[in-house]
């Protein structure tokens, strides 16, 4: 087994799918949008410790989620921070996190890493023909019908609870 194969089991893009594998462990959720915040929320109920790492000084995700996460004793926010290195010989052992303001670097021991970045919809071109929600997703019901007759939206470009390959198909 190569190092990449080992990391594949410890680096996830889906907290719903893989969160239970990290019960009572220390993990990090990376990102600043609603997907990252939802991941952190779910992980906080399962894991001993959850770091939320975001490169900016504030989250772009739903404000309601931000406030809710502050009530969890096992969540620690690392704002203005980025992961610079993933460490481990045969498994994920830690990450090197750099604070972009102070330049300070910290090694965080981790059992799992959940990546939730780069999930911003690119739907602006549809704004003139159908309705978008406050986050830029196309408003559509479970039948994929939009507010405009004859226009349907399928996949992760539309408003929905989960964004995964299996639910986008």
Model-found features: residue ranges?
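Short, small-residue-biased leader/transition segments that mark boundaries at the very start
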Residues: 2-7
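FAD-site-proximal beta/loop scaffold in flavoenzymes
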Residues: 8-21, 117-167
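Active-site acidic short loop of glycosyltransferases
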Residues: 24, 110-111, 148
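Beta1/beta-strand and adjacent pyrophosphate-binding region of the FAD-binding site
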Residues: 26-29
């Amino acid at each position: 087994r190569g190092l990449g194969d080992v990391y594949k089991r410890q680096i996830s893009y889906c907290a719903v799918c893989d969160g239970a594998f990290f019960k009572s462990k220390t993990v990090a959720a990376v990102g600043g949008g609603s997907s990252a915040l939802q991941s952190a929320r779910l992980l906080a109920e399962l894991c001993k410790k959850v770091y939320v790492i975001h490169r900016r000084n504030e989250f772009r995700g739903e404000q309601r989620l931000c406030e809710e996460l502050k009530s969890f004793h096992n969540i620690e926010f690392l704002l203005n921070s980025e992961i610079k290195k993933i460490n481990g010989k045969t498994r994920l052992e830690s990450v090197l996190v750099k604070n972009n303001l102070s330049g300070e670097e910290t090694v965080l021991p981790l059992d799992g890493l959940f990546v939730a970045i780069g999930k911003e919809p690119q739907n602006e071109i549809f704004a003139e023909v159908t309705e978008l929600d406050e986050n830029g997703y196309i408003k559509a019901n479970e039948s994929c019908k939009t507010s405009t007759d004859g226009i349907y939206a399928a996949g992760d470009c539309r408003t929905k609870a989960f964004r995964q390959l299996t639910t986008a198909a």
